[in-house]
Amino acid sequence: MNIIDKGLSFGPMNMNNHPAMLIVHHLEAEGPQWTVEAIHHMHQTEPQFMFAGIGYHYYIRLDGSVYKGRPDNAIGAHCQGCNTNTLGIAFEGNYDNRTEMPDAQFNAWCELKSYLYNKYGNMPVYGHREKGSSECPGANFPLEKVRNANVSPSRVIGWNKDNTGWWYCTDVVNNYFYKDSWELIDGVWYSFDKDGYAR
């Protein structure tokens, strides 16, 4: 998964976010000028926002490129009353006017959703309007298609998480992982049960 990190600089934020829900938004705008840096600047400087920086955690462009917004462990600024323990995902486009989501954008969402599910476990997906006083993500946003997008399981060398717990993969190709043992990882001892989950 290629997530482009532009190294945005933020003001003070509450770093106690524990992602358990995804909330999707439309930007209500599109075009080359709507970069992640432009949104970040707008959220920091325009009077109706005045946030520490971009309120979203991820931004998906129409061309399928995915940009990092605020850190996952930072409480968002994207859905009043529902910013804690959520991740805000913004889609470029005005889905009140735009009638179809480009394949590139939808496919990027599927990749991002898979990445986040593999990192945090299964999380419900909501449109902004379902959790806040808003019409976002727009009348024509394919919310059910986005909500029900298939997730591809993936593994990485190192720590992985699924619905049962955390486990440590040592070989992705052969699916080797620690189990029924104590292991020293990054200077810390961890105990793994017979199924490979950290205790």
Q: Model regions: which residues?
A:
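Short loop/turn microsegments at loop-to-beta-strand junctions
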Residues: I54-G55, G187
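Glycine-rich phosphate/pyrophosphate-binding beta-alpha loops
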Residues: I75-A77
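Short secondary-structure junctions
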Residues: M1-K6, P47-F49, K161
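Active-site acidic/histidine clusters and adjacent loop/turn architecture
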Residues: N16-Q44
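Glycine-/small-residue-enriched capping loops at alpha/beta junctions
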Residues: P47-I54, L62-D63
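Basic/polar, cationic surfaces and motifs that engage anionic cell-wall
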Residues: M1-L27, L62-V66, P71-D72, C82-L87, ...
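Extracellular adhesion/carbohydrate-binding repeat motifs centered on closely spaced tryptophans
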Residues: P153-R199
